[in-house]
Amino acid sequence: MDNLSLAKKSIFFKKLSPLDFNAILRCLNIRIKAFKSNEIIEYEGNPAKNAYLVLSGNLRTAFFDVNGTAIPIKDYSHDMFFGLEYIDPNISFYQEELYATEDSIVLIADLNKLFTPCENRCPRHQAIIKECIMELARTSNSSKKRISELGQQKTKDKILKYLSNTISFL
């Protein structure tokens, strides 16, 4: 299956007609790129200019401590967006590294074009903005649930869970 077919089947584009899909690709200046396993996509401190939609494979965000040890934050699998939260103008740089944990195909969208409707306020662009906002809401709810679960765990359980995630990450 070619990369455009993968993108068309994504939750963000499957409601668009083929004509609208091609138009939105041009409107948003979307690119599709393949990344190899362990290839770094964005470094911490890079200007936050793009959002990344996983079409296949898996991406991970991580912090790296002073010893170079990776501390995993979140995995992104099929139909998950990384970078939508950087639409906030107060956050102009990526705060973590993004890399592929396996061979991956990723759709890259310019953040400014993604959230700024085109001059003629086309309905297809409004549909994409709506999907992005829904994705932000899903992410927010998922984070709230995770924080709530962590708040209910004992410190011992948190440490064991963290260590098991770190060991499986290595």
Residue ranges and their predicted role:
Residues M1-S37, F81, Y86-N90:
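Cyclic nucleotide-binding regulatory module and flanking cytosolic helices
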Residues N38, K49-A62, N67, H78-M80:
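Glycine- and acidic-residue-biased ligand/ion/polar-headgroup-sensing regions
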